[in-house]
UniProtKB/Swiss-Prot annotation:
The gene is infB. This is Translation initiation factor IF-2. The keyword Nucleotide-binding applies. One of its GO terms (molecular function) is guanosine tetraphosphate binding. Its main location: cytoplasm. GTP binds at residues 338-345, 385-389, 439-442. The keyword Nucleotide-binding applies.
Length: 831
């Protein structure tokens, strides 16, 4: 290749080593300087006035490459600045100092752009000079290894521009020291350079904080996450090596506590508690319970102090006192009592102008109802209607406990009856005022004075004769003297000064409860203090839950109930008993604890009152000859009060030989599980105002289970009494039928001794029972083997006739002995 040949420009490539360029250009001398970042050497390029076409083309390409690198660095700087701005926005920096830092970064960007623009103008001047030059360019490289000379040769303002020179990289790669060598090796060694822009480095958290810090020099250094992690692990190892100081606590121990609960209360390991129990000779796991004494020993051995509490303390949250200034006047609660069909429900119909009796079978109220009547003057009276039948005595007694006034209804044409006397006794026991309403005065031929005289016998003395009981003749059907009855109620209520606290948590009593399909458990309650609201947590007996819905006696939904207001609520988990007290608690955990405590008490009480079997009964039962028979029953009813009354009445039936066993009693229709239980135990299902479902009925027919339906309670009781009477053993009674005197003894071959006798009284029957008396002492009792009249066998011989008698398996008979004849008669027993 000759110098005159035209050398085609080829693309230059960068070498393996990375170069950082601090370039300065002198327009007068045509000198450029390059700095190698790795070797810290300075490469100085001097241009002469002469040049060639090859050099010019290389210079053009080099200038274009320099311009490309400058543009790339400019774009890279702008991109990094935008990243910093976004990071600052995402971290939501509200510090004004940080905002000022961003403004500083923006100013730095503007200054950098202003520094790059003059450099671009210098490149244009250099390009023009290179186009006019015709001489060769002498390239000499002066390597300066002393680092101290670099700052003096490189202008300070060019330090902020970082450019990688492709020429320096090419020379470093191929070992070219002069431009002549470059011309010689242009065809063989020079390769077109490829511009490789480095990917932007990922901004670290520490770099971001340094950039955004107030210290412009960046001297504030943050610790890396790895160093923080190492410091934390070191601190943990240091703490682990130190023995933790044990904390001793005051432990509250109830009557019974679980091993795991005791360990949690002391903040001890369960294994340590079990070890202490093993030292005491007790083997228990974490789920088992121990008594309070054992728990106290364990806690004391582990260094804790003990505070003993009674299990009944869980009910202390239900106790609250009312302040006098919070009391407000409330409506009176009146209970209506009396005998069957004396007009109690009709009286309520007249008072509240609704037909309640239409829904009652035969006019007999089957369960308690609570109603609120508002009078013309705006005052209200709450009535509780208790059934009059004797089977509901327990329900009636509960009604008397929650009432302020008792109205005893007596029919003028019927007078005082058994249930009337019982109602009087309940009212006296409750210590509440009594008003006697003599009903049905509209009927002819009545004698009110006779009724008053009967009341005097039971110490019910009217005001007209100096007593303290108001006796008012009324007619519920004709609505006669109802206003006088209302005035008497309000007068007594005013004298009693009835007040209650309407503030705070509600409390009261359960009137009735039942299960209705599609609605769940429905409970009728009477609020006695406080205000009951929706979503309150209520506990009644062993039942608890959240109040989901409240309706008043008219069927309207309400959101709160004040004292003396009866409401029906939904939301309890089970059916409470009529007469159970209800309270409001803070949360469901408290309600659950109280319910569990009450269930344990009821279970212990049931076990303690269970009848003990005598040794004789156990032997008889083991041998299969037990005289005690059982009648298993399953009772289902429409409301809890009816089921409870039926159970109580049946258990009171007197019988020493028949044990009535109620396997299950509940509210709601008969289910398949009831049928399965009845089949397994050979029980009778007694249904009161409920029916069996289709599936339960099919199962009962298949298993041949007896289901009996009733709608009146005393019919049910009479039927069960008849069944129990049929199970009783009949009474065997001896009936004397005659006697004979032995006058002569005959010995007959193959027959034995025959007593020739004379019938002195009654008749003698063959096969009847006989007693042989000698000197009025019974020496034998058996049966007649033979009865003959002369040589003929006869069935009986009457008084005044002679006969021959032979005894079964007995021949020690003498003349003068007396034979008594009797029959055994079985009689059916009744309860």
């Amino acid at each position: 290749m000759t110098d005159n040949q035209e050398i085609k420009p080829k693309k230059l490539t960068l070498g393996n080593s990375k170069l950082s360029l601090n370039k300065s250009f002198d327009s007068l001398t045509g000198a450029q300087s390059f700095v190698n970042a790795k070797s810290k050497t300075l490469v100085e390029v001097r241009k002469s006035s002469t040049g060639s076409a090859t050099t010019l083309s290389l210079n053009k390409e080099r200038n274009s490459l320099d311009q490309t690198v400058i543009d790339a660095n400019k774009e890279e700087f702008n991109r990094r600045l935008s990243i910093l701005k976004k990071a600052a926005e995402q971290s939501q920096l509200n510090d004004p100092s940080k905002i000022s830092t961003l403004s500083k970064l923006a100013s730095i960007n503007q200054s950098a752009n202003s520094k790059i623009e003059p450099l671009e103008t210098d490149k244009e001047v250099e390009q023009k000079q290179q186009n006019t030059e015709d001489n060769k360019v002498e390239v000499s490289a002066k390597i300066v290894q002393d680092d101290k000379d670099i700052p003096s040769q490189i202008p300070k303002k060019k330090e902020e521009t970082f450019v990688k020179s492709p020429l320096v990289g090419m020379r470093t790669r191929y070992g070219i020291e002069s431009e002549k060598e470059l011309d010689k090796t242009a065809d063989s060694k020079i390769i077109a350079p490829k511009i490789k822009l480095e990917e932007p480095k990922k901004i670290k958290k520490a770099d971001l904080f340094n950039m955004l810090s107030d210290d412009e020099s960046g001297s504030c250094r943050t610790r890396s996450l790895a160093s923080i992690k190492r410091a934390r692990e070191k601190e943990k190892r240091k703490l682990a090596s130190q023995a933790p100081e044990k904390v001793y606590r005051e432990v509250t121990i109830p009557e019974v506590i679980g091993v795991g609960d005791l360990a949690n209360a002391m903040s001890e390991r369960v294994a340590d508690v079990i070890k202490e129990l093993m030292k005491l000779g007790i083997l228990a796991n974490a789920s088992q319970t121990i008594d309070a004494d054992t728990a106290e020993l364990v806690a004391t051995n582990l260094g804790h102090t003990v505070k003993r509490v009674q299990e009944s303390d869980v009910e202390n949250v239900l106790i609250s006192d009312d302040k006098v200034e919070d009391l407000r006047t409330r409506a009176p609660v009146v209970t209506v009592m009396g005998h069957v069909d004396h007009g109690k429900t009709s009286l309520l119909d007249a008072l509240k102008s609704t037909d309640v009796a239409a829904g009652e079978l035969g006019g007999i109220t089957q369960h308690i109802g609570a109603y609120r009547v508002t009078l013309a003057d705006g005052r209200a009276i709450t009535f509780i209607d208790t059934p009059g039948h004797e089977a509901f005595s327990e329900m009636r007694s509960r009604g008397a406990k929650v009432t302020d006034i008792v109205i005893i209804v007596v029919a003028a044409d019927d007078g005082i009856k058994t249930q009337t006397v019982e109602a009087i006794n309940h009212a006296k026991a409750a210590g509440v005022p009594i008003i006697v309403a003599i009903n049905k005065i509209d009927k002819p031929d009545i004698d009110i004075e006779r009724v008053k005289n009967e009341l005097y016998v039971h110490e019910i003395i009217g005001e007209e004769v100096g007593g303290d009981v108001m006796i008012i003749p009324i007619s519920a059907l004709k609505k006669i003297n109802l206003d006088k009855l209302e005035e008497a109620i309000l007068l007594i209520a005013e004298m009693q000064d009835l007040k209650a606290n309407p503030f705070g948590s509600a409390a009261g009593v359960v009137i009735e409860s039942k299960i209705e399909q599609g609605r769940g458990t429905l409970t009728t309650i009477l609020v006695q203090r406080g205000t009951l609201r929706n979503s309150d947590i209520i506990i009644a007996g062993t039942a608890y839950g959240k109040v989901k819905k409240m309706t008043n006696d008219k069927g309207l939904e309400i959101v709160e109930a004040t004292p003396s207001v009866p409401v029906e609520i939904q939301g309890l988990n089970e059916v409470p008993f009529a007469g159970d007290k209800f309270n409001i608690v803070q949360n469901e955990k408290q309600a659950k604890d109280i319910a569990e405590y009450r269930m344990r008490l009821a279970k212990e009480k049931k076990i303690s009152i269970a009848p003990r079997s005598s040794l004789e009964d156990l032997f008889l039962k083991a041998s299969g000859n037990s005289k005690i028979k059982e009648l298993p029953l399953i009772i289902k009813g429409d409301v809890q009060g009816s089921v409870e009354a039926i159970s109580g009445s049946l258990l009171k039936l007197p019988s020493d030989e028949i044990k009535l066993r109620i396997l299950h009693s509940g509210v709601g229709p008969i289910t398949e599980s009831d049928v399965s239980l009845a089949h397994a135990s050979s029980a009778i299902i007694v249904s009161f105002n409920v029916r069996a479902g289709a599936n339960a009925l099919t199962a009962a027919e298949k298993e041949k289970v007896d289901i009996r339906y009733y709608s009146i309670i005393y019919h049910l009781i009479d039927d069960i009494k008849a069944i129990m009477s049929g199970m009783l053993e009949p009474i065997v009674r001896e009936q004397y039928i005659g006697s004979a005197e032995i006058r002569q003894i005959f010995n007959i071959t193959k027959v034995g001794k025959i007593a020739g006798s004379y019938v002195t009284k009654g008749i003698i029957k063959k096969g009847a029972g006989v007693r042989l008396l000698r000197d009025n002492v019974v020496i034998h009792e058996g049966k007649l083997k033979t009865l003959k009249r002369f040589k003929d066998e006869v069935k009986e011989v009457r008084e005044g006739y002679e006969c021959g008698i032979a005894f079964e398996n007995y021949e020690d008979i003498r003349e003068g002995d007396t034979v008594e004849v009797f029959e055994l008669i079985q009689e059916q027993r009744q309860l």
